[in-house]
From Swiss-Prot:
Protein name: Probable electron transfer flavoprotein-ubiquinone oxidoreductase, mitochondrial
Superkingdom of origin organism: Eukaryota
Entry function: Accepts electrons from ETF and reduces ubiquinone.
Domain 4Fe-4S ferredoxin-type positions: 591-620
Protein residues bound to [4Fe-4S] cluster: 574, 600, 603, 606
Length: 631
């Protein structure tokens, strides 16, 4: 790995790792104590010394490619770039991956079932006796599968569309573990991988082209004052910036708006995936079994479905995906998931077992209609930042990685003839070189996507997800999807559209609905939300600025605007107990919003589902957030 010479960077990385390590070693209680740190954001009375410290020049580094996000797409991009560089270039390209989690994979959530094709493409020389170039302990071949419609206590078999067939083809994994392995492969080929580094902003030049990124300042108190641990964020200047943040990334959100990348496309629509990993009794374990379910517990007007995957040594992943375009503000995706586990189809597997992990994450469901323009001046979008998930397959890892390979090939062709950065020692000379070089706008990547297997795959299934949003709801969607998948294969002259309202705007007033009475958790099969959050390992320093923003951080005013209409929908769509409405006699509506930011597991649902689109998720300090395992 190439070493940085900048002392500020080295010191900052060490302090970030040290701070997070102290938390892990002490086993700090992170979820049972609600934090009030987001109630008010006080204006700090800064001294001149503190002002000078907060505004000191940032350390700067120059790289060829800066990749924000160390998930499957980001790491695939990085690995392919260095493979090309090592085989056909100088071998000296600086490819840097910045990941906000303290460890690679620590904030990765997926089902997951992998298709092996893209792995063989990325690692063509890797020998494997299991059919996919992964360590055999990380992958379990699907040997049996079911598709069921749940109704009452029944589980009714349903014909499987061809794109959903996994048996004998695909592999059950913990994507959390797989990403850790990918990180090792990236370092082997010379990628610089830096976990625990949060990226807060893009760098723009005078022509509004992206020239790199800025990492977040660390060690600032919730009042805005620098603490003893303060470290100024730094700048990474790059010839090409790759946004691989996953679904609904904060920098991606900036780029989409600034460059109008959704022009001529539909808005994105999302789902919320919630999952647990269980150790089950040997008699309930069926290694290689994968099942998907429709129907119960969701009503006809809510899109979604459940799954259970048996993998590894006695482990079962159980989960539910709920489409976030639901209209009823009383729906709680978390409680729907807990309810689902009591259906006999799931409970008979989980009884006598032990839940060992919990996770939740928003995912893209818009498909081809919602894929934005992929390139902008100085950068590109890859993976879930763009939204390549194949919804009928319930898979996005293979398309995310494939997009990374396409991006890497386009980037390499555009920069392979440029001066080698490592041969320019003077920092001023590097700056001058970057100023002179023309901005790279990779139209070739957009073109490559339209000719790729990703486009073909998404085109074929483009009408399936929006068919569930029609007047006939879930039943109509199932009928259309069956015809489209089994007979038409997407070869129709029309493309269905989603509702013009986004997932937040589509919420209807609570007055149109009755409150939903969910069963209380039994503590055996189903759990209260704080017990689940305690299984995520999430952590945020209580004394840091709140990363969840509402207008003016005015919790009373927020409640005035939201609570009378939607009756606390924020407390129901969040799968981590972050948002509460608590009594407040001074409030005109008798309540105020309370944000328990320490519980946040970075699922991004609040930034998507807030009905007035007035909750903004900002990146917290590097290393903060969940510390997932087996997810």
């Amino acid at each position: 790995m190439i070493k940085f010479t900048n002392e500020n960077l080295i010191r900052g990385i060490r302090m970030t790792i040290s701070a997070k390590s102290r938390h892990l070693a002490l086993g700090t209680d992170m979820t049972r104590k609600f934090s009030l740190s987001c109630r008010f954001l006080n204006k700090a009375n800064l001294t001149e010394e503190e002002k000078e410290l907060l505004n000191e020049p940032r350390a700067r580094d120059y790289v060829d490619v800066c990749i924000v996000g160390g998930g499957p797409a980001g790491l695939a991009t990085a690995i392919k770039l260095k493979q090309l560089d090592n085989s056909s270039g100088t071998g000296q390209l600086r490819v840097v991956v910045l990941e906000k989690s303290s460890v690679l994979g620590g904030q990765t959530v997926s089902g997951a079932i992998l298709e092996p094709g893209v792995w063989k493409e990325l690692f063509p020389d890797e020998k494997s006796d299991i059919g996919i170039p992964l360590p055999k302990e990380l992958a379990t071949l699907v040997t049996k599968e079911h598709l069921k419609f749940l109704k009452g206590k029944w589980a009714i078999s349903v014909p499987e569309p061809s794109q959903m067939i996994n048996k004998g083809r695909n592999y059950i994994v913990s994507l959390n573990q797989v990403v850790g392995y990918l990180g090792e492969k990236a370092e082997e080929v010379g990628v610089e991988v830096y976990p625990g580094i949060a990226v807060s902003d893009l760098i723009y030049d005078e022509n509004n082209a992206v020239k790199g990124v800025i990492t977040k300042d660390a060690g600032i108190s919730k009042s805005g004052k620098p603490k003893e641990t303060f470290e100024r964020g730094m700048e990474f200047w790059a010839r090409q910036t790759v946004l691989a943040e996953g679904c609904h990334g904060s920098l991606t959100k900036q780029a989409l708006a600034k460059y109008d990348l959704r022009k001529g496309r539909q808005h994105q629509t999302y789902g919320l995936g919630i999952k647990e990993v269980w150790e089950v009794k040997p008699e309930n374990f069926n290694k290689g079994f994968a099942a998907h379910t429709m129907g119960y517990p969701l009503t006809n007007d809510v899109y979604g479905g459940g799954f259970q995957y048996h993998f590894g040594d006695g482990l079962v992943t159980v989960g539910l995906v709920v489409g976030l375009d639901y209209k009823n503000p009383y729906v709680s995706p978390y409680k729907e998931f807990q309810k689902m586990k009591h259906h006999p189809y799931y409970s008979k597997v989980l009884e006598g077992g032990k839940c060992i992990a919990y996770a939740a994450r928003a995912l893209n469901e818009g498909g081809l209609q919602s894929v934005p323009k992929l390139n902008f001046p100085g950068g590109v979008l890859v993976g879930a930042s763009a939204g390549f998930m194949n919804v009928p397959k319930i898979k996005g890892t293979h398309t995310a990685m494939k997009s990374g390979l396409l991006a890497a090939e386009s980037i390499f062709e555009s920069i392979k003839g440029l001066p080698v950065l490592e041969e320019v020692e003077d920092e001023d000379a590097k700056m001058a070189m970057f100023d002179k070089e023309a901005t790279i706008n990779l139209e070739s990547y957009e073109s490559a996507f339209k000719e790729s297997s990703i486009y073909k795959e998404l085109y074929e299934v483009r009408n399936i997800r929006p068919s569930f949003s029609g007047k006939l709801g879930g039943y109509g969607g199932m009928i259309y999807s069956g015809i489209d998948s089994l007979i038409l294969k997407g070869k129709v002259p029309w493309t269905l559209k989603f509702d013009e309202k986004n997932d937040g705007e589509i919420l209807e007033p609570a007055s149109k609905y009755k409150p939903i009475e969910y069963p209380k958790p039994d503590g055996v099969i189903s759990f209260d939300i704080l017990t689940s959050v305690s299984r995520t390992g999430t952590y945020h320093d209580d004394d840091e600025p709140c990363h969840l923003r509402v207008p003016g951080q005015d919790m009373v005013k927020y409640a005035e605007r939201s609570f009378p209409v939607w009756k606390g929908v924020e407390s129901r769509f969040c799968p981590a107990g972050v948002y509460e409405f608590v009594k407040d006699e001074k409030s005109p509506v008798g309540t105020r919003l309370q944000i328990n930011s320490q519980n946040c597991i970075h699922c991004k649902t609040c930034d998507i589902k807030a009905p007035r689109q007035d909750i903004t998720w900002k990146v917290p300090e590097g290393g903060d957030g969940p510390k997932y395992t087996l997810t």
